[in-house]
């Protein structure tokens, strides 16, 4: 995504190290995944019940969005902490998928090696490639004028993100409208997605309070790579469960918009 190299130009690469709150956010993500899988297995869910829980699982198991670093920076948080956790969450996801998905979808045969290669490929495309571009832009003398211009443009990454978000949201709405199910069930999935989104942001912020990292931890647990969630739903689960992550895109960005508005208002009035 074009906004990530712009954002990573402002990262201090020496500070990309795991910190204590990363562990707790990761632990809670794993715990929530096991609770969702356990619920499916214990109640032997089938039909719409299984689709609903699979849509929830896809929203929990998927990694933190790379855009979380942009929002965190706009909210005055630590961009290095967020960038580091984005990498870590991708590996958590890679470990959980081959463990959990074969349990709820017997036809799914996901090996650890295959899963890790798929995740690593996506990590390289979404994170590693942009961060390498940013690193060379920052340290290569020929590109110093470009680097200085990017640093001066405080909102450049945010504008790229907003543009990308508009396209993704439009595609998501189209997919939801054409979903092969009843309106009532779509509304129910959307409402459950809203509750899940609020819960993940709230729990993340609660954990972050103990480390003075409310903004970062809330974004880490709440803002998800929903494009990846939709892909895993189509690839490994019932394709209809992709509606859950599709709705989650809308909810998480409404929450982000409210947080950005509140932060901007508070900053200008203080």
Task: Give the ranges of each region predicted by the language model.
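Alpha-helical transmembrane segments of multi-pass small-molecule/ion transporters
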Residues: 1-270
